From Swiss-Prot:
Pathway: Metabolic intermediate biosynthesis; (R)-mevalonate biosynthesis; (R)-mevalonate from acetyl-CoA: step 2/3. It comes from Metallosphaera sedula (strain ATCC 51363 / DSM 5348 / JCM 9185 / NBRC 15509 / TH2). It comes from the Archaea. Keywords: Acyltransferase, Isoprene biosynthesis, Transferase. The lineage of its organism: Archaea, Thermoproteota, Thermoprotei, Sulfolobales, Sulfolobaceae. This is Hydroxymethylglutaryl-CoA synthase. HAMAP family: HMG_CoA_synth_arch.
Length: 348
């Protein structure tokens, strides 16, 4: 392909709650927290949502891209936690960021994989010459039923990428593939405030099977081997699954660590694997190769092979790193977290 990532940006709210505090409120055993491999999760402020976070991440991505925002002719937004059930967030991005009003826009849905599906679409549209640049954003204030195990991991963050031609790219996409089946591991019906999950399906039938198939197909199609890659980034529903996935594929664990964000902030759904990818781009060197494999319940996985170019060196310095947002933090208690994430029902 002749396309790639030109600019990237991250955003993580500064508030955190200890996973052990959530577990304590609901009387969960210490072993439950330990099994997830998590310590803290990010919490949105009272005035933050998936739209505001998307704007923050996109500003950094556009800064790194070093282009006029009006040249962006496509905006795709992937999220499980849209502010409006019926109103386009991607249209809000057009005006908020000063993108071209003659743009193709869409809000995408496929659980945690929606933004990744958007990336494949963006690469194709730029490759075909139908648009010059595309903005793809994944942003979630992840939802979870109070007391459910999901509440221990569901977090908030956003990540954005500007896609353009290979000659301008910081990371050129070599190849991509997808693997999708009808697997009922996680769902939320219309009108339900929180998702449900079929625990028997969440591990092997969903996460592991789909990522394995997508990555294996990518390696077969390209003729590349695990040893050809410097970094691997997998979807991160918790702090353990990505390392188990690495072992299943024969990937050295050292190649996974830089792309891990869930161990630091929890699982921000659409900003999970892609935020890990942004964290890799913050430190990657020219010539290095990165494999990225997002996953979305329902279920599907994409796999990408990226090669880093020398253009990344200048752009790494132009905006805040992912770690900047991860490291600036303020702890809150469960009551504050429950209030800002609207866990309480208020009746007038």
């Amino acid at each position: 392909m002749h396309t790639g990532i030109i600019g990237w940006g991250s955003y993580v709210p500064k508030y955190r709650i200890k996973v052990s505090d959530i577990a304590s409120v609901w009387g969960k055993e210490e072993g439950v927290v330990k099994a997830l491999g998590l310590t803290e999760k990010s919490v949105p402020a009272a005035d933050e949502d998936s739209t505001t976070m998307a704007i923050e991440a996109s500003r950094d991505a556009l800064t790194r891209a070093m282009i006029d925002p009006r040249e962006v002719e496509m905006a795709l937004f992937g999220s499980e936690s849209k502010v409006y059930a019926v109103k386009s967030t991607s249209a809000i991005l057009i005006d908020a960021l000063g993108l071209s009003k003659f743009s193709l826009t869409a809000d995408l849905e496929f659980a945690c994989r929606a933004a990744s599906a958007g990336l494949r679409m963006a690469f194709s549209m730029v490759e075909s010459g139908q648009v010059s640049y595309s903005l793809v954003v994944g942003s979630d204030t992840a939802q979870s039923n109070p007391g459910d195990v999901l509440e221990l991991s569901s977090a908030a963050a956003a990540v954005a990428f500007v896609v353009g031609r290979a000659e301008e790219a910081s990371a050129v996409v070599e190849a991509s593939t997808s693997y999708v089946t009808d697997t009922p591991d996680f769902w939320r019906r219309d009108g339900m405030p929180y998702p449900l999950h079929g625990e028997a399906f969440t591990g092997e039938p969903a996460y592991f099977a789909h990522i394995y198939e997508a990555v294996n197909r990518l390696l077969q199609d390209t003729g590349l081997k695990v040893s050809d890659f410097d970094y691997f980034v997998f979807h991160q529903p918790n702090g353990k699954f990505p390392f188990q996935m690495a072992k299943k594929l024969g990937v050295p664990l050292e190649k996974v660590k830089q792309g891990m964000v869930s161990t630091l902030i929890g699982n921000p759904y659409n900003a999970s694997a892609l935020l890990g990818f942004a964290r890799v781009l913050d430190v990657a060197k020219p010539g290095q190769r990165v494999l990225v494999a997002p996953f979305g319940s329902g279920a599907g996985s994409d796999a990408y092979s990226f090669v880093i170019t020398d253009k990344i060196l200048e752009r790494q310095k132009l905006a805040h790193t992912t770690d900047y947002y991860i490291q600036r933090k303020k702890l809150v208690d469960y009551a504050s977290y429950a209030k800002t994430t609207h866990k309480f029902k208020v009746y007038d």
